[in-house]
Amino acid sequence: MTAEGHLLFSIACAVFAKNAELTPVLAQGDWWHIVPSAILTCLLPDIDHPKSFLGQRLKWISKPIARAFGHRGFTHSLLAVFALLATFYLKVPEGWFIPADALQGMVLGYLSHILADMLTPAGVPLLWPCRWRFRLPILVPQKGNQLERFICMALFVWSVWMPHSLPENSAVRWSSQMINTLQIQFHRLIKHQVEY
């Protein structure tokens, strides 16, 4: 997927996550925190490709990561998301206040990139270092891909006008509870590690 596609897809995912109330924090969150945060991180997984939008601007980071992991390796995995969150919680000074909705927006932007790359034939190694590729190849990579734009805009339009009265037993409500539980457990784990 192109940088433009990732930007559009991250905005669409942010709108969907907020309107679907994917987590309680996102449901109550501020649009001006969630959407810019998602945009900020939506290109980050491609830091492993020196010719990517970020790779060209941050060659001093991109080249070593590309040598170590290759393109669509570690940075396109759930382990990378966990590692970045753990690093954030352990290394960011407590005096730095980042709203919870902005942090979830950043995670959402990163995950939107991985999800978008799953729509290409190459897929992504979600369970890296396991080499299995997860894919739903509906996008064929080509410059100026109109299908890419169409899918992003369709998701955006649906997210804006989706029904807000979803049944309590729907998949969205279930996933919201699961994400909230995982977030609480992650916070407890990090807090426990910091105390010892």
Curated annotation (Swiss-Prot):
What residue intervals traverse the membrane? 24-44, 78-98, 107-127, 150-170
Instruction: List the ranges whose topology is Cytoplasmic.
Output: 45-77, 128-149
> Which key words are in the record?
Cell inner membrane, Cell membrane, Membrane, Transmembrane, Transmembrane helix
Pfam families listed in its UniProt record: YdjM
Enumerate the Gene Ontology biological process terms.
DNA damage response
Which superkingdom, per the lineage?
A: Bacteria
User: Which loops or segments lie on the Periplasmic side of the membrane, by the record?
Assistant: 1-23, 99-106, 171-196
Record localization:
Cell inner membrane
Q: What induces it?
A: Repressed by LexA, induced by DNA damage; it has 2 LexA binding sites both of which bind LexA with high affinity in a cooperative manner.
Matches recorded under InterPro entries: YdjM, YdjM-like
Q: How does it sit in the membrane?
A: Multi-pass membrane protein
> Which GO cellular component terms are attached?
plasma membrane
Q: Which family does it belong to?
A: To B.subtilis YvsG.
This protein's name? Inner membrane protein YdjM
Q: Which gene encodes it?
A: ydjM
